[in-house]
From Swiss-Prot:
PANTHER family reported in the protein's UniProt record: SWI/SNF-RELATED MATRIX-ASSOCIATED ACTIN-DEPENDENT REGULATOR OF CHROMATIN SUBFAMILY D (PTHR13844)
Name by which UniProt lists this protein: Putative SWIB domain-containing protein 070L
Stretches with biased composition (Basic and acidic residues): 262-275
Domain SWIB/MDM2 as annotated: residue spans: 97-181
SUPFAM superfamilies in the cross-refs: SWIB/MDM2 domain
InterPro entries: SWIB_domain, SWIB_MDM2_dom_sf, SWIB_MDM2_domain
Bias (Low complexity): 1-16
Record region (Disordered): 1-21, 199-282
Species: Invertebrate iridescent virus 3 (IIV-3)
Family recorded in the similarity comment: Belongs to the IIV-6 306R family.
Length: 282
């Protein structure tokens, strides 16, 4: 059985983004050019006339090897381009934060021999000067170099107590003593007038009653009503009985009998009854 040895690949070191690394870029460029030269030599060897016994398979192998070298050369040149010609980030403004220049204090001017009242320095410049002073005078702890051991001159400038452990990150808190306090400027008369006008406008706006927005009435939603109940039709006999009962209720009461009074009643008696009564009496 044939034993296949694994292919040994050289590790490629790629620099971090945003940093220049000319050595790595030069290495990628040389590797790319070497691969291109090898590919060209192989291609020229293929084009030269050889023995007639050369098979098609061997020809294909040679062409594949040339293509592989060309691809490797392309990869190396792309890496070189990404490292060498990466676009840089540029900031538009340098007048913010640590880079904004301010007037230094009198204590800082005497400490650094700068002219007081005219020189303006940023926090970055002052920090750089103090770090150089600490390094030159060997004011760092031997075991931990992040700890600063300030001398009397530096203590007076930063106004640090003996109990405080001063470090490079915490030093920024004490740099406020190296600059003059920013005094608020008095407002000009024009600005005062503008402010007065604004206040008058604000008061009038506050006094004016706010318009109450009419709220829209909610739309009346038609509630579905149940269908009317069908009246049950009574049979004919019940209808007749109900009609008779209604008629009885509507009938007038019978007339009262008249009281009999003397002659008038006799006059109204028929003659036949009078004759019969007369015969009976006889």
């Amino acid at each position: 059985m044939f034993q296949t040895t694994p292919k040994q690949v050289k590790p490629t070191t790629v620099p971090k983004t945003g940093r220049k690394n000319a050595d790595v870029a030069h290495e990628h460029f040389t590797n790319g050019t070497q691969k291109l030269e090898e590919a060209l030599l192989k291609f020229e060897a293929i084009l030269k006339p050889k023995e007639k016994d050369q098979s098609i398979q061997e020809f294909r192998k040679q062409v594949r090897a040339v293509c592989k070298d060309a691809k490797d050369a392309k990869k190396f040149l792309e890496k070189y381009k990404n490292i060498r010609y990466r676009p840089k980030r540029t900031r538009e403004s340098h007048n913010t934060g640590l880079e904004k220049p301010r007037m230094i204090s009198e204590a800082m001017a005497t400490f650094a021999d700068w002219e007081y009242g005219k020189t303006e320095k940023s926090r970055y410049d002052v920090t750089k000067y103090l770090c150089a002073y600490i390094k030159d005078n060997d004011l760092r702890d031997a075991s931990n170099k992040t700890i600063i051991l300030p001398d009397a001159k530096l203590k007076k400038l930063l106004q640090v107590d003996d109990s405080v452990v001063l470090k490079y990150p915490t030093m920024q808190k004490y740099l406020k003593h190296c600059f003059d306090e920013v005094v608020a400027r008095a407002p000009s008369p024009t600005t005062e007038l503008g402010a007065a006008e604004l206040t008058d406008d604000q008061t009038t706006a506050e006094e004016a009653p706010k318009e109450v927005k009419k709220s829209r009435k909610p739309k009346e939603v038609a509630v579905p009503q149940p269908p009317p109940e069908e009246e049950e039709v009574a049979p004919v006999e019940q209808q007749q009985q109900s009609v008779e009962s209604e008629e009885e209720e509507l009938q007038l009461p019978p007339p009262k009998p008249k009281k009999s009074t003397g002659k008038k009643d006799k006059e109204n008696i028929p003659l036949e009854k009078v004759k019969k009564e007369h015969k009976i009496k006889k």
